[in-house]
């Protein structure tokens, strides 16, 4: 029997893009990367675990901020190269800027406009030096 992780088309770095959506509203909260271990642990622990390319290690969403993403459903797209995580966003903040979503800017002819408010100051969320 084929392992479910073998069905995923990982990129040349062994990663797959993962989009987190609110399981109730469908709002896109963020995009991050997952490697095989991150996806396997996400399924096993029922919480979002990503691969941090900048830190080169697993990143359990909410490990510093407390803003954990509880997993409700995993979906794989038709090309098997993008994952969607349907999550419950604990604390209502997914973005390191203190906003609900990382997608808080809208394009207008004059450029990108910030349309979503900061819900909590990032300095109050993360330890010094973040």
Swiss-Prot record:
Q: Which UniProt keywords are given for this protein, alphabetically ordered?
A: Amino-acid biosynthesis, Cytoplasm, Histidine biosynthesis, Hydrolase, Magnesium, Metal-binding, Zinc
Binding annotation for Mg(2+)? 77, 79, 81
Catalytic activity reads: 1-(5-phospho-beta-D-ribosyl)-5'-AMP + H2O = 1-(5-phospho-beta-D-ribosyl)-5-[(5-phospho-beta-D-ribosylamino)methylideneamino]imidazole-4-carboxamide
Cofactor(s) for this protein?
Mg(2+); Zn(2+)
Q: Say if the entry is tagged with keyword Cytoplasm.
A: yes
- Tell me which EC number(s) this protein carries: 3.5.4.19
List ligand-binding residues for Zn(2+). Answer: 78, 95, 102
Compartments annotated for it: namely: Cytoplasm
Alphabetical list of PANTHER family matching this protein: HISTIDINE BIOSYNTHESIS BIFUNCTIONAL PROTEIN, HISTIDINE BIOSYNTHESIS BIFUNCTIONAL PROTEIN HIS7
Stated family: Belongs to the PRA-CH family.
Instruction: Identify this protein by name.
Output: Phosphoribosyl-AMP cyclohydrolase
| Species assigned in the record | Pseudomonas syringae pv. syringae (strain B728a)
């Amino acid at each position: 029997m084929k392992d479910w992780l073998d069905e995923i088309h990982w990129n040349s770095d062994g990663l797959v893009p993962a989009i987190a959506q609110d399981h109730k509203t469908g709002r896109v909260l963020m995009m991050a990367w997952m490697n095989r271990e991150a996806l396997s642990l996400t399924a096993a622990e029922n919480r979002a675990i990503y691969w941090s390319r900048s830190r080169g290690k697993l990143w359990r969403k909410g490990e510093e901020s407390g803003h954990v993403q509880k997993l409700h459903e995993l979906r794989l797209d038709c090309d098997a190269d993008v994952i969607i995580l349907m999550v419950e966003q604990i604390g209502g903040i997914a973005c390191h800027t203190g906003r609900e979503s990382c997608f808080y800017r809208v394009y207008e002819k004059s450029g990108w406009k910030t349309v979503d408010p900061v819900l909590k100051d990032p300095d109050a969320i993360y330890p010094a030096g973040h």
